[in-house]
């Protein structure tokens, strides 16, 4: 069985980590640098940093904060937000990121996935997809979940993998911040065909949700969460201990 990863997510706006429900109602949580350092020591396998309003506000992301975060962490760091060109990939990787997550930028210009994969390798290219149920199907949303693209999420993910994305982060808007469990149906649909690692995002409320995720969707590679880790409702060390006791392979 593949070793499962536990990944805290830092959603950053105006230089501060924030949280919300269903991608709305954002409230301030903490400093991204402080949280990044905490999670490195807490046993997180990786860290994801999203500048969540960069695309919506049509600006570059906060590279100064990324550099500071990268200096503090000794685990793989994925950075996203406002990634619209291959030059943006270059800028973020030079700040110390290990992987770059592209979302709205790839919707506007799908060729960015293949171009970045060719230049930096697929292992550096993460396709982040914000998906929501619309009329019985999974639909792709852009600009931080604000804009319905009309695109079928499963087809978009399939296309992204074929273009060179080396990893998928699947964010379910329906379950985001609700803390009632991951979107298992959506994850099963994606993992049924995905040939690259899939990270589940949106909905974690307790340790049991992670156990259910990994036991139900066996092909999912990692669980990503924000608020339950930020507010210490779930400690990563405790989570990993419980996962191991339930027969799920994790790095302790």
Each model region followed by its residue ranges:
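C-terminal helical cap(s) of enzyme catalytic domains, especially alpha/beta-barrels
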Residues: 113-120, 214-252
């Amino acid at each position: 069985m593949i070793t499962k990863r536990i990944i805290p997510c830092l959603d950053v706006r105006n230089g501060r980590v924030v949280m919300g429900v269903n991608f709305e109602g954002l409230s301030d949580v903490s400093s991204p640098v402080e949280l990044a350092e905490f999670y490195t020591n807490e046993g997180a396998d990786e860290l994801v940093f999203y500048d969540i309003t960069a695309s919506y506000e049509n600006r570059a992301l906060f590279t100064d904060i990324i550099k500071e975060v990268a200096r503090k962490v000794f685990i793989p760091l994925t950075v996203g937000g406002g990634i619209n060109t291959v030059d943006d990939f270059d800028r973020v990787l030079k700040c110390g990121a290990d992987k770059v997550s592209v979302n709205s930028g790839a919707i506007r210009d799908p060729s960015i996935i293949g171009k970045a994969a060719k230049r930096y390798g697929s292992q550096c290219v993460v396709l982040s997809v914000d998906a929501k149920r619309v009329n019985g199907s999974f639909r792709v949303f852009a600009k931080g979940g604000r804009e319905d693209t009309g695109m079928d999420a499963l087809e978009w993910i399939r296309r992204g993998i074929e273009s060179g994305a080396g990893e998928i982060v699947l964010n379910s808007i329906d379950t985001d911040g609700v803390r009632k469990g991951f979107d298992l149906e959506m994850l099963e649909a994606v993992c049924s065909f995905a040939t690259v690692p899939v990270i589940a995002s949106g909905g974690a409320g307790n340790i049991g949700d992670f156990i259910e995720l990994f036991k139900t969707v066996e092909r999912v590679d990692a669980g990503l969460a924000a608020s339950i880790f930020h507010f210490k409702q779930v400690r990563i060390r405790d989570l990993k201990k419980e996962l191991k006791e339930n027969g799920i392979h994790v790095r302790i």
